[in-house]
From Swiss-Prot:
This is Metallothionein-like protein type 2. It comes from Vicia faba (Broad bean). Transmembrane segments: none annotated. Belongs to the metallothionein superfamily. Type 15 family. Expressed in the left, stem and flower, at very low levels in roots and is not detectable in mesophyll protoplasts.
Length: 77
């Protein structure tokens, strides 16, 4: 597992991100939380619930950071 000196890791599309990542780790994920208030009136109609979630992309099968915080080809399987 390589961390490029602790300064960056590989993020999406085998580009370097800002966290310390490595093989099988995705450093570019961010988590946000929001609070909302809702009023639900029962018995008027049907409601479709939609949930937002953070996406975890694994399309590049993990990356390794190379020299000077550049990513080597995505060779981690």
């Amino acid at each position: 597992m390589s961390c490029c000196g602790g300064n960056c890791g590989c993020g999406s599309s085998c580009k370097c991100g800002s966290g310390c990542g490595g093989c099988k780790m995705y450093a570019d994920l961010s988590y946000t939380e929001s609070t909302t208030s809702e009023t639900l009136i029962m018995g008027v109609g049907s409601e479709k619930a939609q949930y937002e979630s953070a996406e975890m992309g694994a399309e590049n099968d993990g990356c390794k950071c190379g020299a000077n915080c550049t990513c080597n080809p995505c060779t981690c399987k």
